[in-house]
Amino acid sequence: MATAAAQKPQDIMAIRFFQAIFESSTFVGTHYILGSWYTEKELGKRSGIFTASGLAGTMIGGFIQTGIHSSMDGLRNLSGWRWLFIIDGLITLPVAVYGFLLFPDTPRNTRAPYLSASEKALAISRVPEVSERTPVSWSFLKHCFSTWYWYFFVVLWILAGETESFSSNALLQLYLRNHPTKKYTVAQNNNYPTGVPAVGIASTLFWATLTDFMGGKRYLVGYWIAVTGIITSALILAYPHSTTIHFAMYYWAGSVYACQATFFAWANDVLRYEEDSLRAVVIASMNMGSNAVNAWWSILFYGANFAPYFTRGMWAMIAVSIAMAAWTAALVWMQVRTEKRREITGVTHATVMGKGEEQHEGGGFDQGEKA
């Protein structure tokens, strides 16, 4: 809501800075909590519902902008965009109260008033036994960075984050505003791009449900988004002056949003038998790594000055998509290798730090692998 009172760009920058600090735990924290409650055959759908709800907010936001612009622009001498932030803030307040009072935490420490003692016991029995809480120390950090989990999943999400660039950087909207031959209205600029998150919602729920049904084969989404990135970019490069191609490809690119639910569910699945603290670090690092790269990637390849064709960005998308397919294959190989080791050693959950070497069987590098 404070954005509604902003008078200069620096005000918005300061507000966004503090907003990022306070909301940084929301996305990864929710995926961590979901991974604490649900099994491999359930997690995808729950993660999908969570991420799809965010996409629904983006889609509905476009229609809200159109309505506010047409009915409230100038009301009480405030521009429509200021009313938008006021209304968004009012919508958010009850959600914050709801989360503060009813967020369930994890099965072993939940105080949710809507769960009975028997339901809490059932929740605990459904998920693997975890080790004692490991204190944050140099030993723990060394353990985190000596596992393949951290490197492979962080890079996976960095690549995945950039395959979302068409949608996350609003390229369709920028294309409409900078169309070489046609002038689109404000309503059209707001409404037409809502098809992108709509496709994202359908794709997210489809892939989340399918990978659950197939026993957690989340890697399929990695190949899907790789194919999507290559084909959509190639067709836009081949037909730069076709409005139909641009609309179709940008809508199709919205399906890449499916990686949010499935890749974080994938990390939760693979780390299910490791320490919760390690799982938390890996999941948080995935999002941190993606944001760190995206901070300059978007400017370098998808800046507004490259509109309407974003030729440089199309080539970048093809390169990232090829890398995504290769990295997905490598991660699958590491996952299968780790699962075979667990079967041989009989390790089904992580042991306590310092009480044995078994905890490193699942995720640690051999000396040869470090090289």
Model-identified regions with their sequence ranges:
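Hydrophobic core of transmembrane alpha-helices in multi-pass small-molecule transporters
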Residues: 11-25, 33, 244-262, 266, ...
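Helix-breaking motifs and short loop linkers at transmembrane-helix boundaries and internal kinks
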Residues: 4-11, 22, 38-39, 215, ...
